Amino acid sequence: MGLAATKTKQRFGLDPRNTTWSNDKSRFGHKYLEKLGWEPGKGLGHASHAMSTHIKVTIKDDTMGLGAKLKKKEKKDEFDSGECAGLDVFQRILGRLNGKEEVIADELEKQRKENIINGKWGIHFVKGEVLSSTWDADTMQLKSYSYDKKEITADDAEDAKVSGKHRDRKSRAKREKSNNAALKEKCRDIDRTRKSKRKEKEQEKEKNREKKHNGKEHKEKEHKEKKDKKDKKEKKEKKEKKEKKEKKHKEKSNKRLRSSDSIDDPEATKPSKKSKTKAADSDNVTRDSMLQPRASAASPPPTISTRLSVRSKWIRQKRAAVMDPKALNEIFMVT
């Protein structure tokens, strides 16, 4: 345990070896064993001279399974070092002293290789062995099984030839069929590709034709619309000119009629003079009315909310200034 290892506190009780329990002769188990013939100091079982010491209990302070360390400590053979480091070197020294250095070195190297192979990926490799039925250990060669050749008669030979020819014919026919089928499939594929290319070309041509046709129609529509607009404008202008001419003609005719009437009836001009005097009088009245104060027979102002009270105050002041003739004379510079 180094300084970097985890620190574990061990707590020992008052009786770690549990001697009080083992020395207590008043318990039921002790009395029952004495009735069966057991005496203190003897071992249990058939052999009474066996070990009678207490069992040692170790505290488990790791996450390994039960018996993991014991399995590692077990030695498979005399060359297995287990957990003890440097034991293989010690065994080589002993072998050198005993004159068996080569044997021990070969055995240790073999064990090292097996440990490397078996420890990889957690897989246990099993070496395959040669079957005894196919390997001859004496001659160190594979066994060869030779069958006795039967005597073949002439008829059998002819039958074999005929059957061989028949097989050859069948194989040729199958090959020819397969070749013909492959050629047919190739021809079909070529025809399909040609047809697809032709269809694509025709579709492209049709699209181009439609585009051209649509473009021409669009241009014709635009040209027609422009012509219609021009015609409408010209018609409007002609109508306006005609209306203006008719108005002028009517005005001229009215003037001529008036002039002819005035020559025939000189008194017809009098009402016009009267109308002029009336218009002048109306102008004078309006100017005087502006200077004169208006009638103050107005109803009392209605109640106004507080929000518009300031604005209504200014409006009243303006109205009062307009109603005052002196203020108006000062404004218009009238003396």
From Swiss-Prot:
GO terms for biological process: rRNA processing. GO terms for cellular component: nucleolus. Keywords: Nucleus, Ribosome biogenesis, rRNA processing. InterPro entries: G_patch_dom, PINX1. Residues 155-310 are annotated as: Disordered. Pfam families: G-patch. Residues 163-175, 226-257 have a biased composition (Basic residues). Residues 183-209 have a biased composition (Basic and acidic residues). Residues 25-71 form the G-patch domain. SMART domains: G_patch. It is found in: Nucleus, Nucleolus. GO terms for molecular function: nucleic acid binding. Its main location: nucleus. Belongs to the PINX1 family. Involved in rRNA-processing at A0, A1 and A2 sites and negatively regulates telomerase. PANTHER family: G PATCH DOMAIN CONTAINING PROTEIN, PROTEIN PXR1. This is Protein PXR1. The lineage of its organism: Eukaryota, Fungi, Dikarya, Ascomycota, Saccharomycotina.
